[in-house]
Amino acid sequence: MTLVSKAISLLGFSPAKAPLISVVLHFRRPRALSDQDVQAAVTRAWGRDVRKELNEHIVSRPPISFVKFDRIFLMLSNVSKPYCPAKYLEQALKEFPELRQKKVVKEHKAFLSIDLQNPKAPRRSVKDDCYRRMCRLAAEFVDESCLGVYFPETAHLRPNDREVKNALRSDRPLKEITNWGEAHISANLRT
């Protein structure tokens, strides 16, 4: 323990945790995700296959897959249960005021998370590039079963609509994903 971290601990502050840099797709039902599915998605999303001579690879051990590509290392978790455990459902619903967001939280039965493993705590420009790659990969898995996309770092949940894939494939996905195609419908509206 460093002197600074010891002083912070003695003052009663917990050390700052690195934010979870992740893209989470919520699905209506569990989905199979084979090694070939991940391989094809990487090729479509990033324009080329992994190159062994560059020490790039994809390793799948369902429900987990690892992708090392260029300078990033990702973990994909394909889970056949809700992202939010039942005991936290009510609390999660309070975090999202919009009815379509609540629907995603309530109705999804499975999720696919794409988590950045390396680089750790990247500076802003590197993080933006990592998000671009992660979002482009996520777009390859968006289908009619996908209810929405969640970003744990920003706590933003975007319900799936006709523009989600375009937002994920854009050069500024974190900005574009917050631009919804339709007016928001709030649960707080009174009739």
Language-model features: where?
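A structural signal for short, well-ordered beta-strand segments and their strand-loop junctions
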Residues: 113, 148-153
